[in-house]
């Protein structure tokens, strides 16, 4: 058993063994009180831990290149996001819908109405009325590229009151409505050009 220094029970001086993590206490009469664990290992751990604990926040906050994730760049509303939106979402022309009908109306607007009126009145009856069969036959002779289904659709659009026949005045009124509608659409598209490219708000 290694030698140890003894101290009185009063606790003025703590006795501990340098070679063993235990110390033996005796009272003033010399009676052995037993062997107790030495606080030396605990004190040494505290001395080693406190300096490391002081540096711990700095070690945790330090960033090493290559290990820490790179911060993501926030997309600016007026920057690259607009360019990506303009590339991924093409601006479509509203008049692209029903392109065949628009092409047909453009051909009608370019035609000489005087010549068409002569053919129209020749096929109409004494009241100036022209039924669907005669209307389709006239339009086939004028616009041979149009299908019969499209000509039937045109007849229904001209016959707005659904009487089953059309007159030259009805046809002129239809042409005026189409022209005014196209003019309003053209003006609205012209005004929209000042607001492009539109800003897309992300969800």
UniProtKB/Swiss-Prot annotation:
Positions with biased composition (Polar residues): 87-107
Keyword flag Ribonucleoprotein: no
Region (Disordered): 61-107
Xref: Gene3D superfamilies: EF-hand
UniProt-listed InterPro entries: EF-hand-dom_pair, EF_hand_dom, WD-EF-hand_domain
EF-hand domain mapped to chain residues: 111-145, 146-181
GO MF annotations in UniProt: calcium ion binding
Disulfide bridge partners, by residue number: none
Highest taxon of source: Eukaryota
Keyword terms: Repeat
SUPFAM superfamilies registered for this protein in UniProt: EF-hand (SSF47473)
Protein's name according to its UniProt entry: EF-hand calcium-binding domain-containing protein 8
